Structure formats: C-alpha cells, structure tokens
Amino acid sequence: PGVLPVPNEEALRLTALTGYLLHCELPGHVEFDRKNYFYPDVAKNYQLTQLAHPSTLHGYVDFEMKGEPMRVRITRAHLEEDVGKSFHFGRQSGVDFNRGGVPLLEIVSEPDITSADMAHAYLNALKDILVYGKISDCDMEKGMVRCDVNISVRPKGSSTLGAKVEIKNMNSFSGVRRALQYETPRQLEAIRNGETIHQETRRWDDVAGITESMRTKEDAHDYRYFPCPDLVPFEPSKEWFEQVQQGVVELPLDRKKRFMDQYQLPDGAAEAVSDTLLTLQTKRIV
C-alpha cells in the first residue's frame, strides 16, 4: 500500500545549475538525510536535508566592493525542505505551515566576510547571479530568499574564531547590514567586559535595532543526523549534467569585464550597461 517519495527533479536541476553558476564541484552521488530536532516549526520533528553527500561543494562568488575585487568561498549549496514560519505576538507564538515541505536551496559560505558592508555587497552579488541564472526571482518580500547570519569574533592576533552566534528574522539585505553593525560591537563589548559569548540563536528586531536571544544553538551531533530511509541516493548520468550545464549563463561581473575589454568601456559605463541588462532580464522573468 502506498509508494515511497521521490526527490523533486526540478529542484535537483536548479540546485545543480546553481552549483555551476557558483563554480562548485558537483558530485555524482547525492544522498538525503534526516535532521532530527524538536521545535514547533517542524511538526514531524525532522527535516529532510543533505549532510554527508550534498548536491554541490567548494565554490565561490566573485564581486566588487568600492572598485576592489572580492571573493567569498562557498562551502556548499544543498537541497532541503522548508519548515514552517514562526510568528511571535505578545506572550504567544504561532506557526504557519503553508511553506512546509517546499524544496529549499541553502547556500552556505565560508567565514570570509569581514564587515557588514562586505556582507551586503556579497548578498547583492549572489542575488544577481541567482536572478540572471533564472534560479529564482529572489523577492524577499515574497519569501523567495532569506538570510541567516553567523557572527564570530576573535581577539586581535588570534586565528581562532569564538563562539558562533546565529541571527534570524532579517527581512532585507539592508537589515542584514544593520544587524551586523549592531551585533559585532555587542560581542566585542561583552568580551572587553570579561563576559563569555555563548553559541546561540538570536532574533533581529528591526524596529528596535537590536538582537534578542531566542535559544541556545545546537551542534551538528545534537541533531542526530542519519540517512533518510525513504529516499534512495541520486546518481545522475553524464548526459543529465551536460543538459543542466546548457543553462549556464554569463555572470554579471564577467559580462561587465567583457564589455570593458570588447568595447573599451570605462568601469562605470560597463557596470551601468550590465545592470541595465540585468534589470531587463529580471522583467522578462517576472
């Protein structure tokens, strides 16, 4: 009676295409895992994700910040299922499960971002890649893209990062920048006062301009990951990868550099033309 579930083929294709756009490695063997935890946004108490064998690994995003070339490495871009959306009002909370189970592409970056402005520039560059590559419209107001930020500080001269603090509930890229501009000094001041920074999850209050503690942050072993028994490993063929790769487009920064080389355009003009083409592309997608 009944049938076992199968992965969403279009979600797998878009994840692989994202991997190509972000210069990632694409393994030929992909597995799904169950991430077990007890929290109201997951009614079944586990979330389908990819831990040991994700869809993509080891990429990077190149972008410019105040005319200087920057690069943020990508740890992985993997597929998982979305969870419910939590609402907090007064002393009560609620959960909207309408988006629960919908395929979600999570892009994880390496700790290469060193300032709030760099985080803002990186997010805009990543958004341009995803929009121009026809992965997503990336409309934050419609919940098409969300961002969680992990912040760690370290003493001067030390290469060891401190405890990781995750910040949620940021509804815009400018909100991400404001949250970083608040949280980083908060942690530094706490260390100067002899306090200990604990690994935790905090919530950004955009109206008050502060972060508030939500819960302690779990380590990976606390989730008790194990392979999903219902989903068989995905091992795409060489032809499948070649078909996905046909969807790779010229990235905005590469296009800008080509305009400068091919048409001898100055930096500002090349960027303006590139941005105009990106806007036209976005309108066609919408």
For the regions a protein language model found, what residue spans apply to each?
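Long, charged low-complexity interaction segments
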Residues: E250-V273
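Conserved small/polar residues in nucleotide/adenosyl-binding loops
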Residues: T276-T282
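Basic, nucleic-acid-interacting segments
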Residues: P1-E250, D267
